[in-house]
């Protein structure tokens, strides 16, 4: 199992199964802060799942860099620690938090339910 980069604890396997039960979700992955792929759920090609893990880690790193810079530049606080993100496309969503990410169909996805589930499994 991967250690969650943001929480410093082992991720729980039931978390991925719980995330898979959300409306529209067709895949779930664990990812490390370095982009390593952990466990997966759903029918995801291994190369695609690895690419998603790397994208999730890169997105979190870019957010951290931007939030740190903005905080130092403006003095505004509240952007850190970084927790998660959602990428939206026409038909698909990738949402990640606490070292886990889900892939979902946009038309069926419930962002509020996903946010609550991510927080419940953290």
Go through each PLM region and give its residues.
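Non-catalytic interaction/Regulatory regions outside core domains
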Residues: 2-122
């Amino acid at each position: 199992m991967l250690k969650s980069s943001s929480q410093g604890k082992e991720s729980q396997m039931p978390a991925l199964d719980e995330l898979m039960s959300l409306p529209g979700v067709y895949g779930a992955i664990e990812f490390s802060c370095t982009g390593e792929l952990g466990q997966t759920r759903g029918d995801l090609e291994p190369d695609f799942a690895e690419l998603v893990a790397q994208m999730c880690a890169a997105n979190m790193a870019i957010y951290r860099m931007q939030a740190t810079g903005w905080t130092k530049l403006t003095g505004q606080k509240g952007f850190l620690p970084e927790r998660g993100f959602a990428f939206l496309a026409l038909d698909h969503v990738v949402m990640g938090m606490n070292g886990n990410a889900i892939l979902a169909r946009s038309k069926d996805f419930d962002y509020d339910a996903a946010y609550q589930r991510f927080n419940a499994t953290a």
